[in-house]
């Protein structure tokens, strides 16, 4: 969402935080990035979800997640979904499950393009009370499905991308977008035409946030600017590459930086 906002897209965030210092920091951080937080719910006495990230000398990361108790307590009844029906794109990682699935259904009914970015593996999703069956069921409301590599392989039971697509086509008729780290990214359109883009050849300082940068940049060009899948993948790859050249999840480029770094 922050990457989209930095590229000049008008964005809002729906979710829940506690009224603790972490929650206040989250809200301030989003507002500082020009992300609308009107649909954010503040839960009194609750602890905000947060992470600690350890990075090695090669830029690889290990994430320690503290779920808190604000995030998973969010329900559909607490949210105002009017912003969804007026949006151009609804993006979700399907967490927390019930309000996220409700959002997908409302977006689809309103004709809003939907993007489901499964950011964690199947085991983690199940630990967060989302079953494999519920993930697959959500795909019928999804225009672009972008699972992480581990999640994709666990979900489909294979590491062969063409076989992954054959499996997923029973559930999702939209675009399938697979990010593969150093191996680049691969996409299949609705007609199963395959697009492959290599990763950037650069020195990685910290890969944290690269996937978020990729997705935000892809959505910006493909969903909002109607750029082709392949060209959007190339743009997203360069933005994600830029993110890897600095420390932290927020080293993603703004529009001016993207215009110089990405298109140079």
Walk through the language-model features, giving the residues of each.
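Gly/Ala-rich phosphate-binding loop of Rossmann-like dinucleotide-binding domains
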Residues: 5-6, 108, 223
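Conserved N-terminal subdomain of the carbohydrate kinase-like
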Residues: 6-88, 259-264
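Active-site glycine-rich loop that binds ribose-phosphate moieties when present
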Residues: 71-80, 98, 127-134
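Glycosyltransferases and closely related glycan-assembly transferases
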Residues: 85-86, 101-114
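Conserved phosphate/ATP/ADP-binding segment of small-molecule kinases
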Residues: 110, 119-194
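Conserved phosphate-binding/catalytic region of the ribokinase-like
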Residues: 158-264
